[in-house]
Regions:
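Peripheral terminal and inter-domain segments
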Residues: 135, 140-145, 151, 179-185
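Short, surface-exposed beta-strand/loop micro-motifs that present aromatic residues
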Residues: 147, 154-167
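Short, surface-exposed loop or secondary-structure junction motifs
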Residues: 1-146
Length: 199
């Protein structure tokens, strides 16, 4: 109510099924990657306190309108800072436009310029607050220095180039194809880079 509604982001929400939304893409079929995470010592997340084969809480159906991330789904009821936000390209562009215009929406200062500057100031790892800002280490390869972006586990991404006043928002889904024989999902970075470079 403090961000999405005032920005006119009427198709952006957590838990869309509970909020009357019906149109959204499916993510994965169940939790195959997370099932692997708690079993496979190579991934480093083996949970020894329970036997994942005896736990019957795995989602074994195609996920539609549910956050894909297991921590957000099981522990945080679909609402978290790292996962679970459902949106559209049009709505996300409204958020990007506000960032590009130093916190302004039209003539109204929505978020202070100081806060926007804080969001988009590189730390020691060349990241802002919630934003990747190292163009040599992301799908925004060779972008101008002030560029910023964000990617999601399911394949989504936003790339913004303030000096050129443009953004690329991709709401793709790498999980619909299931896991590769290696046990991982497809890497969306090559197609992200190709689209970003083309734009």
């Amino acid at each position: 109510k403090n961000i999405f509604i005032p920005l006119g982001m009427h198709h952006t929400t957590y838990n869309p099924l509970a909020n009357g939304f019906k149109k959204f893409a499916a993510t994965s079929h169940g939790n195959p990657y997370e099932m692997r995470m708690v079993r496979d010592t190579l991934l480093g997340y083996v949970y020894k306190e329970i036997n994942p084969d005896q736990w019957n809480g795995w989602r074994m159906y195609t996920l539609r309108g549910e956050v894909n991330d297991g921590n957000a789904w099981y522990a945080l009821h679909g609402v978290s800072g790292h996962a679970g936000l459902f949106s559209t390209v049009d709505d996300l562009q409204k958020l990007v436009d506000m960032l590009l215009h130093e916190g302004k929406v039209g003539s109204k200062q929505f978020i202070s310029e100081k806060t926007i500057k804080l969001f988009l100031t590189k730390d020691d790892f060349k990241n802002g607050l919630g934003w990747m800002m190292d163009p040599d280490n992301s799908f925004m390869k060779n972008a101008p220095a002030e560029s910023f972006g964000h990617s999601g586990f399911s394949g989504t991404s936003i790339a913004v180039v303030p000096s050129l006043d443009f953004s690329v928002i991709l709401l793709i889904n790498r999980q619909n194809m299931g896991l590769l024989p290696t046990g991982y999902y497809y890497n969306p970075n090559p197609i992200r880079r190709q689209i970003f470079d083309a734009v």
